[in-house]
């Protein structure tokens, strides 16, 4: 849980990976209080960016895409990952 008041902790650009997942969708509106620009990333489609947001579809296993994703980012909330509990095809279903 974020416990520091947004008025004292503010980043220019904050990156949220795994933004299309359950936790990412829950944190998306809350994290906007902690930054001027919230950069959202996932390999799955994301809803369109709203004011103060950037959306970037990225495969985290692609080094060049990740380096581009991190450009001018001050902080990262990393929720992106691949499920090991189920085969990838079942996770996507």
Show the residue positions of the predicted features:
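N-terminal Rossmann NAD(P)H-binding glycine-rich loop of SDR-like oxidoreductase domains
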Residues: 2-34
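Short, well-ordered alpha-helix to beta-strand connector turns
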Residues: 11, 35, 51-53, 73
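SDR active-site strand-loop-helix element
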Residues: 17, 41, 76-80
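Short, solvent-exposed loop/turn segments at secondary-structure junctions
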Residues: 20-22, 45-46, 82-83
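Short glycine-/acidic-enriched loop or helix-start segments at secondary-structure transitions
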Residues: 25-27, 50, 87-89
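Conserved glycine-rich Rossmann-like NAD(P)H-binding loop of the short-chain dehydrogenase/reductase
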Residues: 36-47
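Conserved beta-strand scaffold positions in the cores of enzyme catalytic domains, especially
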Residues: 40, 54-56
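NAD(P)H-binding glycine-rich loop region in Rossmannoid oxidoreductase-like domains
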Residues: 53, 60-93
């Amino acid at each position: 849980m974020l416990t520091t008041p947004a008025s004292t902790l503010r980043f220019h650009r904050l990156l949220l990976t795994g933004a299309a997942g359950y936790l990412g969708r829950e944190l998306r509106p809350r994290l906007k209080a902690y930054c001027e620009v919230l950069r959202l990333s996932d390999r799955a489609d994301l809803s369109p960016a709203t004011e103060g947001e950037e959306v970037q579809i990225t495969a985290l296993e692609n080094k060049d895409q990740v380096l581009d994703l991190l450009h001018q980012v001050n902080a990262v909330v990393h929720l992106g990952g691949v499920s090991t509990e189920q085969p990838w095809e079942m996770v996507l279903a």
